[in-house]
Amino acid sequence: MTITAADIRRDVKEKDIKFLRLMFTDILGTLKNVEVPATDEQLDKLFENKMMFDGSSIEGFVRINESDMYLYPDLDTWIVFPWGDEYGKVAGVICDVYTPEGEPFAGDPRGVLKRNLKSMEKLGFKSFNLGPEPEFFLFKLNENDEPTLEVNDKGGYFDLAPTDLAGNTRREIVNVLTDLGFEVEASHHEVAIGQHEIDFKYANALKACDNIQIFKLVVKTIARKHGLHATFMAKPVHGINGSGMHCNMSLFTEDGANAFADPTGDMGLSDVAHSFIAGLLKHAYNFTAITNPTVNSYKRLVPGYEAPVYVAWAGRNRSPLIRVPASRGLSTRVELRAVDPTANPYLALAVLLAAGLDGVEHKLEAPEAIESNIYVMTEEERKAHGITDLPSTLHNAVKALPEDTIVTEALGEHVLVNFVEAKRIEWASYAQFVSQWEIDNYLELY
C-alpha cells in the first residue's frame, strides 16, 4: 500500500499529531532523528525534500566543512506511535540522506542497501527477502532508573510464568508492533535467563531493515515502561547464550518464483541457492566485521553457546554458519546464523547480498553440507572437511574487511573508511582497558 502526502496530512489532522520524527541511521547502526512540529509549514518542507540537518556530528557522516545534509522521506514508512505524553502524539517517517546537490549521500547505510538492491535487479532478480530473528535481554533498573546486570527472570527456552516474568512486557511489545503494521509470528522466552525473542514476518530487505530499527525502538520503549532495560548487546552475561539475529534470506524472480527452490535439486535447492551459499561462505571471514561489529560480538561467537564459529553449511544441523530450514517451495530460504543485533541491518544485508550474488554470478559450487556436529570435531577432522574459522576478535575481523573487493564495493569507500576507522578506535580503547578478569587472575599471582 502506497502512502501519499495527502494521507499523512489527513493522519496529522485526524489523529491530532503534534510532532514528527524524521528518522535515519548512522554507520554504526544507531537510529537517529530530527524532530519537528507537525505544522503545515514543516509538512510542506518535508514533502518538498527541504528538511536540512547538520551531519558533521553524526558517526561516520561528514566533516564540519561539508556538514549540510537533507532528509528525503520514504512516505511508505510513515507510522503513528501508539504512545504519547502531555505534549501530544508523535508520528515518524524513515528518511534517506541526500547531499545539497540532490545526490544520495554515500555514507547513508539505507542508501548503501538500495544501491546493492539495484545491482541485484540487473541480474534478473526482483526482490531479496529477509526474515530476521532478533534476540534481546531484559535487565532490571536500579533506584536511579539505570540498568543493572540483574536479569528480570530465571526462565528458559519457551518457559511460561511463573519462571517467565516478562510475558506482559512481550505482549505489550507485540500489541504495539501490530498497531504499527508488523505481522508478528512468535513471541517467547529464549534459552538464556532474561533473554527473549519476538519474530516478525519476512519482507523485502529494505522494509525488513526498516522494521528492525523500529522494532528495537519499540522494545526499548516498552521495556522502560515496565521498569526494565532492553539490550541488544551480543553477550551481556558471561557463561550463558548471547543474543543473535539469525537472517533468513531468499531471492525471488520477476515472475514471483523463489529462486532458491527446485524440487528436483539436491536437498530441494536450486543451483542459484547452492551458488548463493557458496558466495556467503567465500566472503564470510571478510564480512564478519559488518555482521558482528563490536568487541563484545566475539564473546558470543565461541563454542558451546549455540552460536556459529565455523564456516560451513548444512541442512538441519545448527552448528555451522549457514543452515537451510526444512520448509521448501515459496518458503525455501538460507539462514545465516552469525549475525548479531548490534549489526547495522542495512550494511549487513548489503554485504550478505553482494557475497551471495558473487556466488550466483560466477556459478560457484557450494562445498559438501556438514550434517554432523562441528563443535565436537577435532581440528584435523575440520581441516579434512575444508571447514575454517570465523574471526575470533573484532581486531582480526576489521583487519580482514578491506581485503575483500566484493565486500568493500558493496559498502562503498566512504562507509568502508569511516567504519574501519571507528572500529580501530574501538579496539584500541578495549585493548588498553584492564578488566576484572585480569585483576582476578594476575594481581595476587604476580
From Swiss-Prot:
One GO biological process this protein is involved in is:
glutamine biosynthetic process
Regulation of this protein's activity per its record: Inhibited by glutamine.
Site (Important for inhibition by glutamine): residue numbering on this chain: 63
| Residues that bind Mg(2+) 1 | 133, 246, 335
InterPro entries per the UniProt record, alphabetical:
Gln_synt_N, Gln_synt_N_sf, Gln_synth/guanido_kin_cat_dom, Gln_synth_cat_dom, Gln_synth_gly_rich_site, Gln_synth_I, Gln_synth_N_conserv_site
Grouped into one coarse class, the protein's main location is cytoplasm
List the GO cellular component terms.
Answer: cytoplasm
Residues at which ATP binds = 185, 250, 318, 323
Q: Which residue numbers delimit the GS catalytic domain?
A: 109-446
Q: Which cofactor does it need?
A: Mg(2+)
Q: Where does L-glutamate bind?
A: 241-242, 300, 306, 318, 337
**What is catalyzed by this enzyme?**
L-glutamate + NH4(+) + ATP = L-glutamine + ADP + phosphate + H(+)
Q: Which UniProt keywords apply?
A: ATP-binding, Cytoplasm, Ligase, Magnesium, Metal-binding, Nucleotide-binding
Instruction: Look up the EC number in the record and give it.
Output: 6.3.1.2
Please provide, alphabetically and separated by semicolons, the GO molecular function terms listed in this UniProt record: ATP binding; glutamine synthetase activity; metal ion binding
Write out the residues that bind Mg(2+) 2: 135, 190, 197
Textual note on the cofactor: Binds 2 Mg(2+) ions per subunit.
Entry keyword annotation includes Ligase = yes
Where in or outside the cell is it found?
A: Cytoplasm
For this protein, the record's Gene3D superfamilies field holds: Glutamine synthetase, N-terminal domain, Glutamine synthetase/guanido kinase, catalytic domain
**Primary role:** Glutamine synthetase (GS) is an unusual multitasking protein that functions as an enzyme, a transcription coregulator, and a chaperone in ammonium assimilation and in the regulation of genes involved in nitrogen metabolism. It catalyzes the ATP-dependent biosynthesis of glutamine from glutamate and ammonia. Feedback-inhibited GlnA also interacts with and regulates the activity of the transcriptional regulator TnrA. During nitrogen limitation, TnrA is in its DNA-binding active state and turns on the transcription of genes required for nitrogen assimilation.
Similarity annotation:
Belongs to the glutamine synthetase family.
Under the subunit heading, UniProt states: Oligomer of 12 subunits arranged in the form of two hexagons. In its feedback-inhibited form, interacts with TnrA in order to block its DNA-binding activity.
Q: What is this protein called?
A: Glutamine synthetase
- Give the organism the record lists: Lactococcus lactis subsp. lactis (strain IL1403) (Streptococcus lactis)
Phylogenetic placement of the source organism: Bacteria, Bacillati, Bacillota, Bacilli, Lactobacillales
Q: Which gene encodes it?
A: glnA
